[in-house]
């Protein structure tokens, strides 16, 4: 609920009349002599600002891809429509929600530049999220309006919440039932680019982060433990060296996860040990991966080196078709799937 699609009716109407009612559903700002209003960098690289079609000095905000315009949570009408949508789904019988990218809904309304942190002169947008105050008001309102009346289970994608404010986020009095334990499984991320990441996951760092996380969480509630999700490479490849991949190593990885205190989350394919596949550049679909490949090339890496790094860390690894059996396309479809099937599907599949 941080953003919608650029194909959504609201956004289409906003682009047709940015000064009208639907323009207030988004963050549309005047630029600086045709340049973006701020120097914030999107999560996928490049400016968070995109020009409104037909206007030289109007821009809309997108923390992620330009096809994902951020919704204006400061607009009460927008919040009411979001709550109405959530409650509609709860009325259909849903038990709860995974709430994605939720920490991005509160913006710095001063719209000030940040100290650049890269050669592009931009600064990561998450630094804005980390310094603004008042997100709790939105989260509590959403909880009281949408989740409490249904006794819903909610899992927030809230990264790197400080220990002293954890009780505000999880437990009976928290904004959510629980949040994902990202810190341990992100221990390999030693910088902001793929080429700075470790491979495979450094075990000692993972162990240290896991024990630390478990210790601080127990005072407030419990976390949702993960090894992988749709935004990461396959855990079977990230945590296990390729030469050690097999039944026993996968079983050990599963045991470590399942024996931790908290709520284990299994991502589709994880239960059978689905792993990363080998990629060609033309096969990548993920915008983040494509951008990271080019960042590696611009840093002086060869095509082969950049492809290897991109293949290791690409989110596309977690988005290949589920491997049901050894039939064509792993039994996923008789038609050509939108992403290529992992080459090992004849060995690694549900059947």
Task: Please report, for each region that a protein language model flagged, where it lies by residue.
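Hydrophobic residues within beta-strands of alpha/beta enzymes
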Residues: 97-99
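C-terminal catalytic domain of photolyase/cryptochrome flavoproteins
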Residues: 317-319, 323-350
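Acidic/aromatic-lined carbohydrate-recognition and catalytic surfaces
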Residues: 1-87, 91, 104-164, 169-171, ...
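Short phosphate-binding/catalytic loops that engage adenosine nucleotides
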Residues: 94
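Short glycine/proline-rich turn/loop motifs
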Residues: 59-74, 121-123, 231-240, 341-350
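Conserved alpha/beta catalytic core and glycan-binding cleft of carbohydrate-active enzymes
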Residues: 6-39, 139, 143-321, 326-329
């Amino acid at each position: 609920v941080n953003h919608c699609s650029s194909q959504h009716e609201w956004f289409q109407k906003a682009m047709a009349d940015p000064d009208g009612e639907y323009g207030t559903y988004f963050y549309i700002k005047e630029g600086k002599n045709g340049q973006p209003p701020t120097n914030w960098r999107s999560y996928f690289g490049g400016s968070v600002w995109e020009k409104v079609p037909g206007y030289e000095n109007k821009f809309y905000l997108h923390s992620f891809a330009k096809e994902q315009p951020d919704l204006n949570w400061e607009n009460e009408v927008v919040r009411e429509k979001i709550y109405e949508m959530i409650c509609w789904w709860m009325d259909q019988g849903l038990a709860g929600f995974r709430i994605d990218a939720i920490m991005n809904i509160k913006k710095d309304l001063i719209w000030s530049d940040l100290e650049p942190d890269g050669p592009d002169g931009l600064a990561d947008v998450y630094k804005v999220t980390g310094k603004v105050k008042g997100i709790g008001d939105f989260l509590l309102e959403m909880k009281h309006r949408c989740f409490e009346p249904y006794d819903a289970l909610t899992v927030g994608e809230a990264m790197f919440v400080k220990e002293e404010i954890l009780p505000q986020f999880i437990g009976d009095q928290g904004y959510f039932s629980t949040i994902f334990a990202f810190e341990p499984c992100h221990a390999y991320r030693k910088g902001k680019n793929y080429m700075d990441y470790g491979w495979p996951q450094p075990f000692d760092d993972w162990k240290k982060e896991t024990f630390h996380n478990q210790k601080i969480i127990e005072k407030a509630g419990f976390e949702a433990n993960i090894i992988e999700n749709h935004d990461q490479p396959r855990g079977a490849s990230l945590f296990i060296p390729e030469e050690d991949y097999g039944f026993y190593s996968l079983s050990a990885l599963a045991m470590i996860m399942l024996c931790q205190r908290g709520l284990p989350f299994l991502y589709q394919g994880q239960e059978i040990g689905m792993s990363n596949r080998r990629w060609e550049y033309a096969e990548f679909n993920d915008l983040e991966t494509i951008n990271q490949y080019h960042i590696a090339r611009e840093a002086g890496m060869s095509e082969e080196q950049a492809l290897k790094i991109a293949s290791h860390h690409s989110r596309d690894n977690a988005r290949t078709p589920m491997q049901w059996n050894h039939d064509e396309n792993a039994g996923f479809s008789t038609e050509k799937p939108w992403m290529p099937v992992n080459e090992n599907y004849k060995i690694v599949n549900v059947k």
